[in-house]
Curated annotation (Swiss-Prot):
GO terms for cellular component: plasma membrane. Its main location: membrane. The keyword Ribonucleoprotein does not apply. This is Fluoride-specific ion channel FluC 2. Belongs to the fluoride channel Fluc/FEX (TC 1.A.43) family. It comes from Ligilactobacillus salivarius (strain UCC118) (Lactobacillus salivarius).
Length: 129
């Protein structure tokens, strides 16, 4: 198999293929469920990634290309919240998990706010032209 910087081409193709499926599923659910779609997608994704990580991948010993395709590709494209949740579950102490949660939520909010303000300002500059 061809390797690209120590990543096998089959794994990249798997992530791409399953990513298309996950992204498409997310889009279709958001069309059907409107405002409740996001929370449903995040909850389903959290369950799916945890299930894949802690049961299927560990117990069933799937090939690396398939487990990466399903986890990073499909669930990752379906939602990034699931990855966030599994990361917190993997931390060794409650303090570490709390710190990670606070940094993620507060940092995410601050960056979203900054992006919003920057977008508004750049949008107004574009209106003047």
């Amino acid at each position: 198999m061809i390797e690209v910087q120590n990543v096998k081409l089959g794994t990249l193709i798997s992530v791409f293929f399953f990513g298309m499926i996950g992204g498409t599923l997310r889009y279709l659910l958001s069309l059907k469920l409107a405002s409740t779609g996001t929370i449903l997608v995040n909850l389903i994704g959290s369950f799916c990634l945890a299930f894949l990580t802690y049961y299927v991948i560990e117990r069933q010993k799937l090939p690396a290309w398939l487990s990466t395709g399903l986890g990073t590709g499909m669930v990752g494209a379906f939602t990034t919240f699931s990855t966030f949740t599994v990361d917190i579950l993997g931390l060794s102490t409650f303090t570490d998990a709390t710190f990670y949660l606070l940094i993620s939520v507060v940092g995410g909010f601050l960056l979203a706010y900054t992006g919003m303000i920057l977008g508004i300002k750049l949008g107004k500059v574009g209106d003047r032209r």
